[in-house]
């Protein structure tokens, strides 16, 4: 029996290895097929019916079953501590992410600053972005979990204008009839126990 799942890269890297190991011990006869990538691409694949379970970040217009799995604070990462009031004057290393997340970052930025970021580098590779930060070339804006494998960088949690941490939510989406497929029901129930 097979259960196709799609997930975002960050969740695939930091959570899915442990989840899949535990799931396979509990359900050794259920085979999992997983694909990872950007939230907007994976969500589109899910809507097209290619996958039974979708783990994505951010706000999506999903009206069937969903479960909040995780909240990750958004941070400004830099080699040295930052004065957040002066952020527009620091060199910015822009990680070209999915459009939904970029909108969140843009909304946060322009709620706090009148000037655009002083962008010096743009990259679509998160590891490249973090290496540039690690070398002291500038700062970047990412979820806190993205920097956990990069030593010697400092995260500063972004806050709303009300002073609350800015969080990025990770959701598991599945359809109302998920219980009709044994493998999908097993995985959804397993995730409900863990999260």
Label for each model-derived stretch:
Residues 91-114, 180-181, 188:
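Secondary-structure junction motif
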Residues 5, 34, 53-55, 76, ...:
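Generic preference for hydrophobic
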Residues 67-68, 75-77, 139, 169-173:
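Residues embedded in well-ordered beta-strands
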Residues 37-90, 145-146:
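Acidic, Gly/Pro-rich loop/turn segments at junctions of secondary structure
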Residues 1-61, 122-123:
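Central regulatory/effector-binding core of bacterial HTH transcription factors
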Residues 15, 157-195:
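A late-sequence structural motif
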Residues 38-39, 114-159:
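Hydrophobic hinge/microswitch elements
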